[in-house]
Amino acid sequence: DRIYFGQEFGELGMDSEGFSGRDGRTTIFDYWSVDTIRRWRNGGKFDGKMLTDNQKHLYGIYQRILTLCNEEKAISQGDFFDLMYANINGWRFNEHKQYTFLRKYGRDLLLFVVNFDHISADLAINIPSHAFDFLQIPQMEQYRAVDLLTGKEENISLLPYKATEISVEGYSGKILKIKL
């Protein structure tokens, strides 16, 4: 729920600052100036022009996610349903490398799918019947979903007896919004 000291730029925390030295963590002491923050500040212009292309891309993702947290009531106020217990030892879902859950507010259902692996994954996500009952989701063979991170549309099924198939790039995720 918080961004810490350059995280939005991919800060590595590999400077040799403070008492702990080069340990992969950013110091908590205010006498240090973090490289990515300095480059984002760009001499007081705060325009990020000195950041690398990868850092700018990551910053854009963080901006989008934080904006969604304020715009989407399903995120800020909605009901939560964890899907991990229904996907342990899944044939096309690795609970050690992927994470998924649902959020719902009114007629808006959000399916979050995150892939922490470096390779793309074609996932089969089980949504148990309890989720349909608890969140009052109508079962349908085909829903139109919009990925809130990219704006791309895709068709998905939401059925308790058939896995929902989702493709996710490596080190990436999707927030699929479905209007019920």
Functional labels for PLM-detected ranges:
Residues E141-Y161:
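Solvent-exposed beta-strand/loop surfaces of large extracellular or lumenal domains
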Residues D1-Y143:
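Loop/helix patches that line or flank the sugar-binding groove of alpha-linked glycan CAZymes
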